[in-house]
Structure formats: structure tokens, C-alpha cells
Amino acid sequence: MTVEGFFDPATCTISYLLFDSGSGECALIDSVLDYDPKSGRTRTASADQLIARVAALGARVRWLLETHVHADHLSAAPYLKTRVGGEIAIGRHVTRVQDVFGKLFNAGPAFAHDGSQFDRLLDDGDTLALGALSIRAMHTPGHTPACMTYVVTEAHAAHDARDAAAFVGDTLFMPDYGTARCDFPGGDARSLYRSIRKVLSLPPATRLYMCHDYQPNGRAIQYASTVADELRENVHIREGVTEDDFVAMRTARDATLDMPVLMLPSVQVNMRAGRLPEPEDNGVRYLKIPLDAI
């Protein structure tokens, strides 16, 4: 198992390439379509880095995984699918996100709320094959109702936590930054606490890969820790922090946070599996901005 991270400084997002060298198969996780909110321009520079690395490895893309419907960047999954293939997968509870935001954006009857925009909807405990690797979907709601953690192990080997990895999306961050916010529609701090405890019940040596790193105090980029690191050092949820204490802390902290800059553009695209709106009769695509609604 090889894991490579690709950091996008504009959104502090880490996209991942998960590679099984024996089979040559790979998965791309939480990709980014570059978007400039001032000009409305999209670019594919971040996604093209993944494409170049896939080509350099001679890999075959089997899965394009989303840990959740992101509210801080646009997904590049459809672009990647056209360039390198792969099936787009997300947690089945994406339908709850589609219900909420379909109404907010007045998406109309043409917008299906059944997750059919994605190739594969995953339930808790579902597994995906990637060569000799097994990817298990672990439902970890709290940040959003649809959040999934992807736990990766060798499919046919005796379990060894040193060879296990989990892509945690927006649940945990590096120990010096803590945990994800829970104040988006459908978010819930108590659910997040329980989800994180589920992640932290994995073997202590399991490597945890973050979806974001905000470089507190200007430190260098970091995006991987272990279960043991988080239990020992996480500033929000280390061992000994009770559920009630966490909920109180998370609720108070969330009340001070601004909305992500790209939330409105991101969600209306990502609830459609990253597909941009169809051009109107003048050949131009448009995003919607609801006024005084959030």
C-alpha cells in the first residue's frame, strides 16, 4: 500500500492517491477542482497533478472516493473520470444532504435526491476491492450526515495495524488543530464525538490521513497521524474528554466560525457528484447564490 498526498493551499485540502503496486490499481480520494470565487473561473491544475502521478506510476484508476459533500472546495471527480476513469463513490446518506440543499438552491424536479449522480452509494461496512487492498466504508456522521471514513487493509494478509490506514475526511484533524465543525445543516456535535471514538477504536498504530491541514502557528504541512497520536495529543478529543465536554466545546467554537468562502459554490456542485451546471442558452454556466437564506 502506497499513499501520496497532494496539498491545495487555496483550500487547505489534501487529496490522496492510494496505490496497490501489485495490481497497479489506485483510488483517488477527495480531489479538488480549482475555483476562483472572484472571477468565477475554474481550473484543473490540482486534478492534473493527480493525473500526472497516475501516468507516472502506470496505474489504473478504479475508484474516485468522496469522504462527504465538501463545503470548502469543488470536487474534480467528473473531470478525473473523463481523463483517467474510475467510479465515483460516496456514503449513501448523501441523499439527506441532497434533500436539504436541493431545497436551499431550489434545484427543481430535474434534480434527483436519490444519489443517482454517483456511481456507487456506500453503506456502513461495505467494502471495495483495490487489488490486494480492501477499503471498508465506516459511517462517521457529525460534520455532515453523509461523512464516510475509508479504512484500508491488506485484503488477504493477517491483520497488522502497521499496514492499516484510514482516510478520515472532516472528522479529525492533526492533533494540534483538533476536530471538524458541526454547524452545517445536518451536522451534530454529539454524533461527531461518537464517530471519532469509533475511528479511535481502530488499532493504535493505524495511520490516519486528514482531509485538511490549516498549519496552526505557521508550522509546516502535516496530514498524517496515528490513532495513538490522536488519543494522546488531540487538543479537542484526546483520551479522557467526555462526550458532554466535547459537545459544549464544539458548540461554543462553532458559534465563532465564519462560513467557508466556497460553501455556496461547493455544495451545489458537490451534491451533484462534482458536475457543473449545464450551460444556459447563451453557452454560459451559472451558480446560484441564495440571499438571506442561511
From Swiss-Prot:
A divalent metal cation 1 binds at H68, H70, H143, D170. It comes from the Bacteria. Probable hydrolase. Does not have beta-lactamase activity. The keyword Hydrolase applies. It is an enzyme of class 3 (hydrolase). A divalent metal cation 2 binds at D72, H73, D170, H212. The keyword Calcium does not apply. This is Probable metallo-hydrolase BURPS1710b_2304. The lineage of its organism: Bacteria, Pseudomonadati, Pseudomonadota, Betaproteobacteria, Burkholderiales. Keywords: Hydrolase, Metal-binding. Its EC number is 3.-.-.-. One of its GO terms (molecular function) is hydrolase activity. Belongs to the metallo-beta-lactamase superfamily.
